[in-house]
Amino acid sequence: MEPAMSLCDLKRATRRKRRVRLKLRSLSSVRLSVFKSNRHFYAQLIDDEKGATLAAASTLEPDVLATAKRRVNSEAARVVARLFAGRLDGLDANYRKFVLDRGSCRYIGVVAAFADELRSLGFEF
């Protein structure tokens, strides 16, 4: 069993999330929000003007569950990125450009693998 986050770590993560969201507020109305837990990875495209989620994908999808056995890894994040790109292509509006809202997650490992895969599929952020 992994130890819970300390109070100092939680405060640091909260500050990081606020700092990132404050910078993103002025950039675009459409943002790609990602969240990583120890077992799963989630991504959703959010339109802040409408207050609606346009598309979402995660490792909880049946297609991805086989790749992510017990913990989230870079390969599972790449599969989620391909699934997410397919869902974005299915939308009637052309969402090829948005900003990445990494929240309290640092841009390394799984988040970087997800972003690199989306960039290789032709998305800009």
Curated annotation (Swiss-Prot):
Pfam family, one: Ribosomal_L18p
Gene Ontology terms describing biological process: translation
Claim: Cytoplasm is one of the keywords in the record: no
Record CDD domains: Ribosomal_L18_L5e
Entry-linked InterPro entries: Ribosomal_uL18_bac-type, Ribosomal_uL18_bac/euk
PANTHER family: 39S RIBOSOMAL PROTEIN L18, MITOCHONDRIAL, LARGE RIBOSOMAL SUBUNIT PROTEIN UL18M
Gene this chain is encoded by: rplR
GO CC term, one of those recorded: cytosolic large ribosomal subunit
Full protein name: Large ribosomal subunit protein uL18
Protein source organism: Anaplasma marginale (strain Florida)
Family, as annotated: Belongs to the universal ribosomal protein uL18 family.
Domain of life: Bacteria
Assembly description: Part of the 50S ribosomal subunit; part of the 5S rRNA/L5/L18/L25 subcomplex. Contacts the 5S and 23S rRNAs.
Signal peptide start and end residues: none
Key words, A-Z: Ribonucleoprotein, Ribosomal protein, RNA-binding, rRNA-binding
Function as written in the Swiss-Prot or TrEMBL entry: This is one of the proteins that bind and probably mediate the attachment of the 5S RNA into the large ribosomal subunit, where it forms part of the central protuberance.
A GO term for molecular function: structural constituent of ribosome
